[in-house]
Regions:
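Interfacial juxtamembrane loops and adjacent helix segments
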Residues: 65-128, 312-379
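Signature aromatic-anchored transmembrane alpha helix within multi-pass, membrane-resident enzymes
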Residues: 25, 225-228, 289-298, 414, ...
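Short helix- or helix-capping micro-motifs
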Residues: 27-28, 157-162, 189, 210, ...
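Transmembrane-helix signature of polytopic, membrane-embedded enzymes
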Residues: 20-25, 92-108, 140-163, 196-205, ...
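Membrane-interface transmembrane helices that cradle and orient dolichyl/undecaprenyl
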Residues: 187-203, 232-238, 242, 247
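Hydrophobic, aromatic-rich transmembrane alpha-helices
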Residues: 393-430, 487-488
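Transmembrane-helix motifs of polytopic, lipid-linked glycan transferases
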Residues: 127-147, 186, 190, 406-413
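Specific aromatic-rich, kink-prone transmembrane helix
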Residues: 139-143, 179-196, 209-210, 470-477
Length: 490
């Protein structure tokens, strides 16, 4: 059965690595130009002054109470050009108490102290954050190209990233959402590469990127639990593949003799050797996985200068019901104060955990109503973020994503109908298996489910912005409609 493919000789230019590299540079330069221009045209958002003041406080005082609900990586970077350019200070609005959010008042004080010049300071702070979006585009390109085995696939994913309105909107801002999308995608990409070919070098790169992702947004704390689960699933699929391969008798060689003591002993020795080798490999991978998680934790603490790291759990004052055990969110307390767990040191920076607690409090009780399609209400909708993505992404991108699922279904059918064929999706990228798609989809789907399950309030589609990068890597599969048509022989 022949499937419709577009056979255009011009598409072979993407087989040329130099031509592909030139196109990547052009797309990234165009993307950077759009972000740089937008940064000069749009006024600061409500959150940006607080983020910038937080970064300035990190550098000046080495403290992280301001805007603690977000880790400091984006703050650090955005503040650098402002420090170099010089600014007027006003720290009088700072205060700290359980549940305190001084960043908004302090952001207003910063604008008041710097007057009209604050617009220029926000502009250069925004420009400093542009590389985050460029890094995200590169990870899109590399993962798509490696997954689908095609330069064109990588270019499709990069194109979608570079001209995605939501990425363009947040990539120009002094906020952590685009950086979280980029580094979260990069961390999952490097972890997938480690799963395919484990090694200490790759494990080190994964651990470092995990730490950077954790320093962009607390949402990625889930990776500490997801990755061990994904690794176990990966091992299980490898085990099944070995069993399937061992049950297929060779067709071009005589059946080995199993009679006699010598033959039986030799077979047993081979089987034992394979078992020992496999066990050793699993133990090595497990050690590397532990190293990945520990290195990620180390980089996270390093980003905070180990500020309050390993504080005992009972020494915190929380405000969310999940951590206080109280009936009302916002009331200070600590449910672990009198428990055995309270004596355990927390391996996270103090302000990081306080930020998680404060964000959780907002999810439990939020004073402002939510809005969707002409309706205001206290609380939210489980489909709010799905609806937001549907109306905020271009129809062209949605059509390409729909074509991606069609492509996958077509080649799934094709691989299943091939005699003796394993469930391999793409003939020219025969290494792609269901576990690769699991590695691509597990993190974004988990993020989408977790955010959608917080029904106390629904605000800002940016909370699920990282989903787009993974979706556009998946969209690279559509490159296979542009392969040269194969002519049947015989």
């Amino acid at each position: 059965m022949q499937f419709p493919l577009i056979s255009l000789r011009g598409w072979t230019v993407f087989d040329n690595s130099k031509a592909t590299a030139c196109l990547v540079v052009v797309l990234l330069f165009t993307h950077a130009g759009l972000l740089a221009y937008s940064a000069t045209r749009h006024s600061p958002t409500m959150n940006e002054p607080g983020h910038l003041v937080a970064g300035l406080s990190h550098w000046k005082f080495g403290r992280f109470e301001i805007y603690r609900v977000n880790p400091p990586l984006t703050h650090f970077v955005a503040a650098i050009p402002v420090i170099i350019a010089g600014y007027n200070e006003d720290w009088s609005g700072f205060y700290d108490s359980p549940g305190a959010r001084p960043e908004f008042k302090m952001g207003e004080d910063f604008v008041r102290a710097n007057g009209e010049r604050s617009i220029w300071l926000f502009t250069i702070a925004r420009w400093a954050c542009i590389p985050f979006s460029l890094i995200g585009g590169l990870f899109c390109f590399f993962w798509s190209r490696e997954l689908w085995g095609s330069n064109l696939a990588g270019l499709i994913s990069l194109f979608l990233w570079c001209f995605e309105p939501n990425i363009l909107a947040h990539g120009e801002l002094v906020t952590p959402d685009c950086a979280a999308s980029a580094f979260g995608l990069g961390a999952c990409y490097l972890f997938w590469r480690w799963l395919r070919v484990p090694g200490w070098g790759r494990a080190g790169a994964v651990g470092a990127m995990l730490g950077l992702a954790e320093l962009t947004k607390t949402s990625w704390i889930m990776l500490f639990g997801l990755w061990p689960l994904l690794w176990l699933c990966w091992l299980w699929t490898e085990h099944r593949s070995r069993i399937s391969a061992s049950q297929i008798p060779p067709t071009d060689s005589p059946r080995p003799c199993t009679q006699g003591r010598g033959a039986g002993g030799e077979g047993s020795n081979d089987q034992a050797a394979r078992l020992v080798s496999h066990t050793s490999s699993v133990l090595t991978q497990f050690t590397q996985l532990v190293g990945i998680l520990l290195l990620g934790l180390y980089v996270l603490n390093l980003g905070y200068g180990f500020d309050g790291s390993f504080t005992r759990l009972k020494d915190f004052t929380f405000v969310s019901k999940a951590f206080t055990g109280l009936k009302e969110a916002g009331d200070p307390g600590n449910r672990f104060h009198a428990s055995v767990l309270g004596n355990l040191p927390v391996p996270f920076p103090k302000q990081y955990l306080r930020g998680v607690d404060l964000q959780k409090k907002d999810f439990e009780h939020y004073g402002q109503p939510s809005y969707l399609r002409g309706e205001w209400k206290q609380g939210g909708w489980w489909y709010y973020y799905l609806y937001g993505l549907a109306v905020k992404t271009p129809h062209g991108s949605q059509a390409i994503l729909l074509l991606s699922f069609v492509t996958l279904a077509v080649y799934w059918h094709r691989s299943r109908s091939t005699p003796g064929g394993e469930a391999r999706f793409i003939p020219s990228a025969s290494h792609v298996r269901p576990r690769d798609l699991l590695a691509l989809s597990l993190a974004p789907l988990t993020l989408l489910v977790l955010v959608s399950s917080q029904l106390e309030f629904n605000h800002h589609v940016r909370y699920v912005l990282p989903v787009l990068g993974f979706a556009y890597v998946f969209a690279g599969v559509t490159a296979f409609w542009f392969r040269p048509r194969r002519t049947a022989v015989g």
